[in-house]
Amino acid sequence: MSKVCQVTGKRPVTGNRVSHSNIKTKRRFEPNLHHHRFWVESEKRFVRLRVSSKGMRIIDKKGIDSVLADIRSRGNRV
């Protein structure tokens, strides 16, 4: 499974690991993803999403129904 947040679209980015002697090697910055079950009252069921911590805050703010509508409008099946 890809490491992409289903709410925000956050994905890994690349950067440099820098040693004490300033030698740079490539590394990946991974998003803080979690599999989380959300109760959807309108559908009377749980929905399991792969979301970042930022995505969880967005769901708390906007509500799960609004966020699911956005995800489904992008063509993703939930």
Swiss-Prot record:
Biological-process GO terms, alphabetical: translation
Organism of origin: Alcanivorax borkumensis (strain ATCC 700651 / DSM 11573 / NCIMB 13689 / SK2)
InterPro entries: Ribosomal_bL28 (IPR026569), Ribosomal_bL28/bL31-like_sf (IPR034704), Ribosomal_bL28_bact-type (IPR001383), Ribosomal_bL28_sf (IPR037147)
Bridged cysteine pairs (disulfide): none
GO terms under cellular component: cytosolic large ribosomal subunit
Family annotation (Pfam families): Ribosomal_L28 (PF00830)
HAMAP family assigned to the protein according to its UniProt record, in alphabetical order: Ribosomal_bL28 (MF_00373)
Protein name: Large ribosomal subunit protein bL28
